[in-house]
From Swiss-Prot:
Belongs to the RimP family. The gene is rimP. Disulfide bonds: none annotated. Its main location: cytoplasm. The lineage of its organism: Bacteria, Bacillati, Actinomycetota, Actinomycetes, Kitasatosporales. This is Ribosome maturation factor RimP.
Length: 177
């Protein structure tokens, strides 16, 4: 896809995505056999549920139908979110990943896996897991030291907010009995 077409698609679609309360993260046009696929990735600070994705998909489809931005040939429009193990490339991505475990590739070389505790304009406050039973430590990581960052999926993390709510619910049920 030419840069001109990519820029034109972004200029055309970004206001529609923003009007739905979402951020346009990525646009890609790929050829699959004779068909083309226009993939649009959207997100927001509060996440994008299926209803919001369906709404923005309909709005984008209508806008693309009334313009020639995709040219004459057939294409398929796919609208989705970045996924669980998204790359963090912009400040807002780090803010959204607060309290998530992230794998960092450092500019100096090396790798770091840590949980984002806080984000400001200069960098991140992290919690680095302890090794061999040791307590976690905190670390400051300036944005300039980060080469790449990707959210890690956690399957067995204890969610303290839900645990506290469950304990409260159990006490309430026991008190009622």
């Amino acid at each position: 896809m030419s840069t001109t077409q990519s820029e034109r698609l972004r200029e055309l679609l970004e206001p529609l995505v923003a009007s739905q309360g979402l951020d346009l993260e990525e646009i890609a046009v790929d050829s699959v056999g004779r068909r083309r696929v226009l993939s649009v990735v959207v997100d927001s600070d509060t996440g994008a549920d299926l209803d919001r994705i369906a709404d923005v998909s309909r709005a984008l489809s209508a806008k693309l139908d009334e313009t020639d931005a995709m040219g004459e040939g057939e294409y398929t429009l796919e609208v989705g979110t970045p996924g669980a193990e998204r790359s963090l490339t912009q400040h807002r991505h780090y803010v959204r990943a607060t309290d998530r475990l992230v794998r960092f590739q450092l500019r100096e070389g090396g790798e770091l896996v840590a949980r984002i505790l806080a984000v400001d304009e200069d960098g991140l406050d992290l919690e680095v897991p302890g090794v061999k039973g040791r307590r976690p430590t905190t670390r400051r990581l300036p944005f300039g030291d980060i080469d790449k960052a990707r959210v890690q999926v956690e399957f067995n993390r204890k969610d303290t907010k839900n645990d506290n709510q469950t304990e409260h619910d159990n006490k309430t049920e026991e008190e009622e009995a």
